[in-house]
């Protein structure tokens, strides 16, 4: 079964603020200084478009014994039998290097010996229940 990444209004606002700020400055400045505004506006708009593309291409799929995590071109597979524990996470700051989730409330999956990953499926409880059906030895930490 496939699960989409949860959506956070907070993340959208944080990514839109620079675009709107540069656009506002560009509107209220003299015409000569508008040329200075276009490069930052272009960069922030491009970053917002990339963020949007990443959001719409991020999903988590449970395929038999494998958890597939997909984000645009990057895909990773985790054997569900190797998942040790799942921890609910509500922190905005994440210590994980790889974080294919677009909401600050998600779950951290610990697998192998030292590996972990943060994801944010829309239906966390249903997602965890399906993982537990395949591997009932997964420890759930609240």
Name each region found by the language model:
Residues 1-32, 104-108, 114:
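N-terminal membrane-targeting/pre-transmembrane regions
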Residues 16-23, 42-52:
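Hydrophobic alpha-helical transmembrane segments of multipass integral membrane proteins
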Residues 33-43:
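Hydrophobic alpha-helical transmembrane segments
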Residues 46-80:
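Conserved beta-hairpin
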Residues 70-126:
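Non-transmembrane, membrane-adjacent beta-strand/coil modules in membrane-associated proteins
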Residues 139-142:
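Conserved short beta-strand edge segments in small beta-sheet-based binding/regulatory domains
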């Amino acid at each position: 079964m496939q699960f989409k990444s949860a959506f956070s209004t907070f993340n959208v606002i944080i990514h839109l603020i620079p675009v709107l700020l540069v656009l506002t400055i560009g509107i209220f400045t003299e015409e000569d200084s508008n040329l200075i505004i276009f490069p930052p506006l272009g960069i922030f708009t491009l970053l917002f478009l990339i963020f949007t593309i990443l959001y719409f291409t991020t999903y988590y799929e449970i395929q038999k014994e494998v958890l597939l995590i997909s984000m645009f071109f990057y895909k990773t597979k985790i054997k569900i039998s190797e998942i040790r524990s799942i921890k609910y996470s509500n922190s905005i700051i994440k210590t994980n290097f790889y974080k294919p989730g677009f909401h600050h409330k998600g779950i951290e999956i610990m697998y192998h010996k030292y590996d972990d990953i943060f994801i944010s499926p829309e239906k966390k409880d249903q997602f965890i229940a399906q993982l537990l059906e395949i591997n009932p030895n997964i420890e759930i930490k609240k």
